């Protein structure tokens, strides 16, 4: 696929001035920036604009391009890297900052209330516990407000002071020279770490952080029907908020141990039931285990291995309360590894007959049951 003309990419004529090239580049880079643009091919267009600017903003590269086209532009310097810096030491982070950071944007109050961080806790349940639900008392490490300083971080009897370097704003102005001129950016004040306040005398308990590490016991109700990998949100049981903000949430991630007999698919429970050849061929009534207790299941004569039977309502309850799953029983014939002489003779007799009568089926059934 041939490359587009660099002037066309920037929407300029070949006689465009350096300032016109810079303005066109800034406008298009902002338009197609991947963090801002919602267009499907924004990344490709952004790279195309960046490549065009890299060539046309350099007098030597531009002269080669004007004379030889793309072949001349690619001679004497490496191909476009896509993720590197812009020409002239002006980086990707700088251009983004000049567009969306700086003095024109809304500044967040460093002392405004902020929600605390969310926490995650892993819990492992038995198969039946996940089916029927459970109530747990879990102990988690959290950061709570310091009782000594009431979360201020300052020694009792003292208070925080306004930072003189940023006048309490938590931000300072930094000037930067760029190809587009001098730009003023705002960044967090290094003296107060962006808080706008200085603690002269720190609390000896929390050392100025305003928080202490504790282990907190929390009651968690596991709903019936929860499945492996699902999580429960316990509102307000995460880390404490900042500056009086609300606490975060606790997310309890559930893991379910495998069962030796049952498997689970959504709200349904699957199991395999081993049966003898005689039971499959002649039919029988068997007891099938379920998580709700044993139930009777009728096996029709002539049932094939792999046949699936449904036990309605014997699965797991839906975790959101939308009904109950079923249990599916898959029957498998178990081929005996040791046969008596009588059993072998009867099987040979069975295999040699075109049509089997009831008397032969009766003999087979009694033989395999040891009667």
From Swiss-Prot:
Q: What are the annotated GO cellular component locations?
A: cytoplasm
* Residues the entry annotates as binding Zn(2+) 1: 146, 149, 203, 206
Q: Does the keyword Transferase apply?
A: no
Q: Where does Zn(2+) 2 bind?
A: 163, 166, 189, 192
The UniProt similarity line reads:
Belongs to the DnaJ family.
Q: Which NCBIfam families match?
A: DnaJ_bact, PRK10767.1, PRK14280.1
| Protein name, per record | Chaperone protein DnaJ
């Amino acid at each position: 696929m041939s490359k587009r003309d660099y002037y066309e990419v920037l929407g300029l004529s070949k006689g465009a001035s350096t300032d016109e090239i810079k303005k066109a580049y800034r406008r298009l880079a902002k338009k197609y920036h991947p963090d801002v643009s919602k267009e499907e091919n924004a990344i490709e267009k952004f790279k195309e604009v960046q490549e065009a600017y890299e060539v046309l903003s350099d007098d030597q590269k531009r002269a080669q391009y004007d004379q030889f086209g793309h072949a001349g532009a690619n001679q004497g310097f490496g191909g476009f890297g896509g993720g590197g810096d812009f020409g002239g030491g002006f980086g990707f982070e700088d251009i983004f900052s000049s567009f969306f950071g700086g003095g024109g944007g809304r500044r967040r109050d460093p002392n405004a209330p902020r929600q605390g961080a969310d926490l995650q806790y892993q819990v492992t349940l038995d198969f039946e516990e996940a089916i029927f639900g459970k109530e747990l008392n879990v102990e988690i490490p959290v950061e709570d407000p310091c009782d000594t300083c009431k979360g201020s971080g300052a020694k009792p009897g003292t208070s925080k002071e306004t930072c003189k370097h940023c006048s309490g704003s938590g931000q300072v102005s930094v000037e930067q020279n760029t190809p587009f001129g001098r730009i003023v950016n705002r960044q967090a004040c290094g003296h107060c770490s962006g808080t706008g306040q200085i603690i002269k005398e720190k609390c000896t308990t929390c050392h100025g952080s305003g928080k202490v590490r504790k282990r907190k016991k929390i009651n968690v109700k596991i709903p019936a029907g929860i499945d492996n990998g699902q999580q429960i949100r316990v509102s307000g049981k995460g880390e404490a908020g900042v500056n009086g903000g609300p606490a975060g949430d606790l997310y309890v991630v559930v893991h379910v141990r495998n069962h030796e007999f049952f498997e689970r698919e959504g709200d349904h429970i699957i199991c395999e039931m081993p049966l003898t050849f005689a039971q499959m061929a002649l039919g029988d009534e068997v007891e099938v285990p379920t998580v709700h207790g044993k139930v009777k299941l009728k096996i029709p004569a002539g049932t094939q291995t792999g046949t699936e039977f449904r036990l309605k309502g014997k699965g797991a309850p839906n975790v959101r309360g939308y009904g109950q799953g079923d249990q599916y029983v898959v029957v498998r014939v178990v081929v005996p590894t040791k046969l008596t002489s009588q059993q072998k003779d009867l099987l040979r007799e069975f295999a040699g007959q075109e049509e089997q009568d009831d008397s032969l089926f009766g003999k087979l059934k009694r033989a395999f049951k040891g009667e």
